[in-house]
Structure formats: structure tokens, C-alpha cells
């Protein structure tokens, strides 16, 4: 039997910490859209590796952007 794992886990990193971002703003759609899947759901931090501080800011920014019609609430193809 092999002791080696079947796949190699890559270390997850926080994109906002790497960019030295102080605050996640709702007007910065390029950063926000990386954290939304195609049906307009917010990707959890356990998948993206985002720190909890930035995940809370990101969720708040996405909700504000949706309210201001900068981002859709649901997918258009439904």
C-alpha cells in the first residue's frame, strides 16, 4: 500500500491580504466578482481561503452592490 496522498493540497491564501487591501469596497467590482460563482452565490471562505475579516467585508460589499444593481441577485439564465 502506498502511503502517499492521492492529491497534493495547495495552500490557500487570502487574496486581499496578498494585495495589502485595507478595506473591501463595493465599488471595486473586479475584486468582488472573483468571490462569486456563476449563479451569483458568494463562495465560502473555506473554499477561497479568504480570512474571516475580509470575508465579512466581502459579504457586506456584495450585498450593497446587489442593492445598487451593480451585481445581479440571481443568474440571468434561470
From Swiss-Prot:
Gene Ontology molecular functions: small ribosomal subunit rRNA binding; structural constituent of ribosome
SUPFAM superfamilies assigned: Ribosomal protein S18
Gene Ontology BP terms: translation
A Pfam cross-reference name: Ribosomal_S18
InterPro entries: Ribosomal_bS18 (IPR001648), Ribosomal_bS18_sf (IPR036870)
Keyword list, A-Z: Ribonucleoprotein, Ribosomal protein, RNA-binding, rRNA-binding
Keyword RNA-binding: yes
GO cellular component, one term: cytosolic small ribosomal subunit
UniProt keyword RNA-binding, yes or no: yes
Family note: Belongs to the bacterial ribosomal protein bS18 family.
Function: Binds as a heterodimer with protein bS6 to the central domain of the 16S rRNA, where it helps stabilize the platform of the 30S subunit.
PANTHER family xrefs: 30S RIBOSOMAL PROTEIN S18, SMALL RIBOSOMAL SUBUNIT PROTEIN BS18M
Subunit structure: Part of the 30S ribosomal subunit. Forms a tight heterodimer with protein bS6.
Protein name: Small ribosomal subunit protein bS18
